[in-house]
């Protein structure tokens, strides 16, 4: 009995390890990967699941129609039927939408707001943070969202962007000092009448990169919560 349980546990652990390694190998930040014969076979099988999910979701969203047609005998679709969403981007958009729903149900709403670049309005020190424009990571959404290397890639990118912002701020401050020393009219003592209008707040250029740091941290925490991170 114990040997059988140990064998099942080892088999499960090997399956999880191999699955994580496959997802890591599929992680393609530059989108240069080529589809193999195995990928084509997997796509053939998953297209049926895509079509079934899309058809059920479309009927569920349309409240005007009767949902009595949702029976197993009627929703079964043959594999040779042309998919309703043959476009790769549309299929990946549906995958990302489904995965986003899973993440939003598994993490607090405050963390979700941080991912989208804004803190919760309920907190007193909430400040709006501009979103970071990060490049597209991969053409394989599942590989990106489940591979542990995706979070590390995001972290390195955020560090690189933060360094660029620091260098930009240093260059800007040195330019302002040089302008003031070379005869700026304001620096010579020109009087500016005081007004009650407060200056327009300027967002720090480092704020967008704080959003990117929060994104990869939340991605790592979501992976740990859902058991998708490699052991």
From Swiss-Prot:
Alphabetical list of InterPro entries matching this protein: C2orf80
Alphabetical list of Pfam families matching this protein: DUF5563
Positions of the UniProt region annotated as Disordered: 153-206
Transmembrane portions of the chain: none
Chain intervals with Polar residues compositional bias: 192-206
Compositionally biased residues, Low complexity: 166-179
PANTHER family referenced in this protein's UniProt entry, alphabetically: CHROMOSOME 2 OPEN READING FRAME 80, GAMMA-CRYSTALLIN A
Listed name of the protein: Uncharacterized protein C2orf80 homolog
Protein source organism: Mus musculus (Mouse)
């Amino acid at each position: 009995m114990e040997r059988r349980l140990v064998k099942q546990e080892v088999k499960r652990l090997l399956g999880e390890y191999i699955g994580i390694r496959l997802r890591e190998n599929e992680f393609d930040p530059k989108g240069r990967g080529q589809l193999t014969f195995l990928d084509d076979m997997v796509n053939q099988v998953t297209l049926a699941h895509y079509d079934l999910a899309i058809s059920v979701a479309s009927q569920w969203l349309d409240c005007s129609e009767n949902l009595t047609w949702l029976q197993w005998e009627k929703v079964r679709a043959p594999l040779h039927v042309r998919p309703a969403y043959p476009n790769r981007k549309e299929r990946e958009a549906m995958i990302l939408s489904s995965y986003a729903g899973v993440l939003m149900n598994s993490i607090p709403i405050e963390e979700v707001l941080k991912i989208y670049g804004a803190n919760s309005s309920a907190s007193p020190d909430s400040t709006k943070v501009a979103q970071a424009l990060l490049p597209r990571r991969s053409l394989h959404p599942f590989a990106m969202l489940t591979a542990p290397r995706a979070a590390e890639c995001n972290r390195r990118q955020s560090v690189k962007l933060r360094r660029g912002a620091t260098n930009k701020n240093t260059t800007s401050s040195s330019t302002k000092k040089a302008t003031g020393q070379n005869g700026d009219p304001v620096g010579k003592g020109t009087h500016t009448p005081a007004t009650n209008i407060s200056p327009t707040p300027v967002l720090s250029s480092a704020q967008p990169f704080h959003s990117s740091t929060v994104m990869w941290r939340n991605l790592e925490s979501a992976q740990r919560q859902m058991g998708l991170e490699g052991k």
